[in-house]
Amino acid sequence: MIKDKWMPHTVSLICFHQDTPFLVLLRGVMLQSMNGRSVQRRGDVEENEATLYIPLSVRAENAAGEDLSFLPPLEYARCTEPEKHWTLQPEGESAGRCSFFVKGEIPEACSLAEARENYDFVYVVAGWKLHDYGSPALQHWEVASRVSSHYYQYGS
């Protein structure tokens, strides 16, 4: 019950193994985004970024509903069964292929260009931190991302 209240979002994560995109559905996550401009001492500043909080206990599944397990990016790149796993590939560290996600559930894996064309809330993974200390209820990934879609709305 508490998880539903504090982690109310679903995202569709796309991760790449070589040039093949794989769809990962993450339900029970928290997405906080800032899309637009803010006024600061230096003037208007564009702030198109988001933070995705993923509990370590999240159920990650493919479109068929099969459970997937997390692998760090280098281990994922070497794995022989990428369809059974997922990862977070930050921009600039994955030989041109970085993970991105779409707010909500999408039906199938797609390229970043296709996601930008078809969905409003598209985010590119810029980096992530693993918080694997404290009680299991507090353990999570904190994923920094930048808005990559054409749609910009303050406070979405």
Model region roles, listed by residue range:
Residues 25-156:
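Short, conserved turn/kink motifs that form compact alpha/beta structural patches or helix kinks used as
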